[in-house]
Swiss-Prot record:
InterPro entries linked to this entry: GCS_T, GCS_T_bac, GCST_C, GCV_T_N, GcvT/YgfZ/DmdA, GcvT/YgfZ_C, TrmE/GcvT_dom1
GO BP annotation list: glycine decarboxylation via glycine cleavage system
Organism: Clostridium botulinum (strain Langeland / NCTC 10281 / Type F)
EC number: 2.1.2.10
HAMAP family listed in its UniProt record: GcvT
Protein name: Aminomethyltransferase
Gene designation per UniProt: gcvT
Stretches assigned to coiled coil: none
Function comment: The glycine cleavage system catalyzes the degradation of glycine.
Keywords in alphabetical order: Aminotransferase, Transferase
Pfam families for this protein: GCV_T, GCV_T_C
NCBIfam families noted in UniProt: gcvT (TIGR00528), PRK00389.1 (NF001567)
Catalytic reactions on record: N(6)-[(R)-S(8)-aminomethyldihydrolipoyl]-L-lysyl-[protein] + (6S)-5,6,7,8-tetrahydrofolate = N(6)-[(R)-dihydrolipoyl]-L-lysyl-[protein] + (6R)-5,10-methylene-5,6,7,8-tetrahydrofolate + NH4(+)
Length: 370
């Protein structure tokens, strides 16, 4: 795997039996003890992920809030200090450049967390729209490591090695300068699994020590390292979208059912606003739906969705769900076929298998919302 980047945790994967793959140009573990075991560990106990491949950027300055609002579809004005917001960044046509988290530290200080596969593109896009805004934009990706600790026991375990009461960090809130095993970190109650949990940002040189400290703290409870395989099945069951599967620059947030994060009534303009207003007024022509495969098989990304011999869309993500123990998926289909209960076929290896549209909220989240 020459020419691939590594995270500050690259040296620990093999200690835990990690199987390494190329993901977004990084050497990362796809699994440790097996993705099914890891999936259930996060659903029932707690699991630790290396997500240091994610990108981070700081935006500061007098116009930081205005600038971020210009880039994002969600309402940045509602964000208070030490809060986190999920949002989309769109192009002029309303297509998704990326989905990301915006952290507001204090005043005019914002921290953006962006997808690894879009890191360079996003930073270039953000810097390219600076214009006359009085802001400073700094790509801080290489100076930050990120761990995600997720699962129903995550708080109980992490509490053993931190100097704050984690119950004070509510869902989509953050706290800076938290001492985790004596190391200064940013901790937020956020995640990508559908479970309660935390994302921990630290200095790269502290990452290995924190990795071992967290797993040691959770040894009795059964905490385990988790690879990319389970990360994807976990987010999929919770109907959390993946850039490149459910979204790209030709797909809008409205088409994938994420209109809640597109605030068309905000006073300020944002990139793609006019196109999204027009699309909402005219009505979407395609829609993201959940489906269950009724025949035996497993749906995969890119498989055709067929109705009465006509291709009406494609599968964006599909798995045999480890939690629900059935073959389910997400598909982007023509709007008239998106109603729950609609039957259609999925073309799996030259065979058309029966499927039915279902609610795409496959798994109810257990995050602490209050």
């Amino acid at each position: 795997m020459e020419d691939l980047k590594v995270t500050p945790l690259r040296g620990v994967y093999e200690e835990y039996g990690g199987k390494i793959v190329d993901f977004a140009g990084y050497e990362l573990p796809t699994q440790f003890k097996g993705f099914l075991h890891e999936h259930h560990t996060v659903r029932e106990k707690a699991g630790l992920f290396d997500v240091s491949h994610m990108g981070e950027a700081m935006v500061t300055g007098k116009d930081a809030g205005k600038f971020i609002q210009y880039l994002m579809t969600n309402d940045i004005n509602v964000l208070k200090d030490n809060e986190v917001l999920y949002t989309f960044m769109c192009n002029e046509d309303g297509g998704v450049i990326d989905d990301l988290l915006v952290y507001k530290f204090a005043g005019d200080e914002f921290f953006l967390v962006i997808n690894a596969s879009n890191k360079d593109k996003d930073v270039k896009w953000i810097m390219g729209h600076k214009g006359d805004f009085d802001v400073e934009i700094v790509d801080v990706s290489d100076s930050i490591a990120q761990l995600a600790f997720q699962g129903p026991l995550a708080e109980e375990i992490l509490q053993k090695i931190v100097d704050v009461d984690l119950q004070e960090i509510k869902f989509f809130k953050l706290k800076r300068d938290v001492l985790v095993d004596g190391k200064k970190c940013l901790v937020s109650r956020t995640g990508y699994t559908g479970e309660d949990g935390f994302e921990i940002y630290c200095k790269p040189e502290d990452a290995k020590g924190l990795w071992h400290a967290i797993l040691n703290a959770g040894k009795e409870e059964g905490a385990q390292p988790i690879g990319l395989g389970a990360r994807d099945t976990l987010r999929f069951e919770a109907s959390l979208l993946l850039y490149g599967n459910e979204m790209d620059e030709t797909i809008t947030p409205l088409e994938v059912g994420m209109g809640f994060f597109v605030k068309l009534k905000v006073e300020e303009d944002f990139i793609g606003k006019d196109a999204l207003i027009k699309q909402k007024a005219e009505g979407i022509t395609r829609k993201l739906v959940g489906f269950e495969l009724l025949d035996k098989g497993i749906p995969r990304h890119g498989y055709e969705v067929i109705k009465d011999g006509k291709v009406i869309g494609h599968v964006t993500t599909g798995y045999k769900s480890p939690t629900l123990n059935k073959a389910i998926g997400l598909a982007l289909v023509e709007e008239q076929y998106s109603k729950i209960g609609t039957e259609f076929n999925i073309k799996v290896r030259k065979k058309e298998l029966k499927a039915v549209a279902i609610d795409k909220r496959f798994y109810t989240k257990k995050t602490k919302t209050k």
